[in-house]
């Protein structure tokens, strides 16, 4: 769900034009991928460059918390199309800046057609920024905190069909419960598991997906 580099083939370790690191050795756009949830160019590029690659940057963690919460009840494709608008509206996903949003900012966001104009989701993003800062203060970084739910190491699964993928796990249940206890909103277990998939806490690429081995190697580093 992100922008890609200009070359037709991504390097083994590179950076997209949005600044996001990715790991890939396959064409940046494929007509088909075994991970069949990626059905259009934007989703396939996201799948090929980001999905499942371990995240260790707090701004990116806040981005995924914000976007996954916004996606509740909607399709991920919808959020992908709005991602750039979210990046602008939410100050490059800087939690320190978002935490300072007030009534004027809420009014601005409700008028922004580029994002999901839902008051509950907007207010939750602001509240989540404040909770995020509290976690950073307690643990040093959100990254150090959140990876504890998988003991600091990605879980590498071996799914052969999409129907095998779980919607939630014991780990996502634990994450959801603790995040809610810390004041986060729109962080149910299903949302938490989707975030774990996206940020590489689990590798849920199918074993016959060209990205499976590359993401597994990244997870072992």
PLM features: residue spans?
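HhH-family (HhH-GPD) DNA N-glycosylase catalytic core used in base-excision repair
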Residues: 2-5, 12-221
């Amino acid at each position: 769900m992100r922008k890609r580099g200009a070359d037709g083939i991504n390097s083994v370790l590179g950076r997209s034009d949005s600044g996001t690191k990715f790991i890939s050795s396959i064409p940046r756009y494929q007509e088909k991928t075994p991970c069949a949830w990626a059905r259009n160019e934007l989703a396939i590029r996201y799948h090929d460059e980001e999905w499942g690659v371990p995240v260790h940057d707090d701004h990116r963690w806040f981005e995924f918390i914000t976007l996954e919460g916004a996606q509740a009840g909607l399709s991920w494709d919808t959020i992908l199309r709005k991602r750039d608008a979210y990046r602008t509206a939410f100050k490059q996903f800087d939690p320190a800046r978002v935490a300072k949003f007030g009534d004027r900012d809420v009014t601005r966001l409700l008028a922004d057609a580029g994002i999901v104009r839902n008051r509950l989701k907007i207010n939750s993003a602001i509240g989540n920024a404040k909770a995020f800062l509290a976690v950073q203060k307690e643990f040093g970084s959100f990254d150090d905190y959140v990876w504890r739910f998988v003991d600091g190491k990605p879980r590498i699964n071996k799914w052969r069909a999409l129907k095998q993928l779980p919607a939630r796990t014991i780990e996502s249940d634990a994450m959801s419960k603790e995040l809610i206890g810390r004041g986060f909103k729109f962080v149910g277990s299903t949302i938490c598991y989707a975030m774990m998939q996206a940020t590489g806490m689990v590798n849920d690429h199918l074993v016959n997906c060209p990205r499976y081995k590359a993401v597994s190697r990244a997870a072992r580093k």
